[in-house]
Amino acid sequence: MSNMYCGIGKVPKGKERGTPEHCFQSNQIRYYGIKKIDKSLLEKPKKKRLSLIKEQTKLNNLLEKGKRMVKEANKLKSIINDPESSKTEIRNAKKKLEKIVAKKNKFVLELKQQRQVVDELLEEEREKEKAERKAEKAKKNKKKSSTKTKKK
């Protein structure tokens, strides 16, 4: 499907004219125009497609952010517990630590939501793969049964 062309002009070498459905899904209704495309396609609500890879990248970025927050908090705790630290350093470290603790709750919620999104996308991928395997199996069984009937 990546070698489909939905433009108005001449189709470039190595590409083929995209189907109305493909062009509609890729938001490229130029060649077909609104009148030639099936009305049912236009009426379907556009669902925001989430990419599994993008969502996993977001999750990994959040995990890295969490690791940085933990390192920063540990560093600030060591400054607070160090007997050689001055009072101003301790005061500043406590303020920064309070800010990090306040950010932590928001971060944990954000991380849970992102994990849920990734898990849902993974489940959808598994279901699609199962459906494809079933369709292939049915196709193979259909071919086998049709060849058996032809031989008789």
Swiss-Prot record:
Residues 127-152 are annotated as: Disordered. It comes from the Viruses. Residues 136-152 have a biased composition (Basic residues). Belongs to the mimivirus R546 family. This is Uncharacterized protein V12. It comes from Sputnik virophage. The lineage of its organism: Viruses, Varidnaviria, Bamfordvirae, Preplasmiviricota, Maveriviricetes.
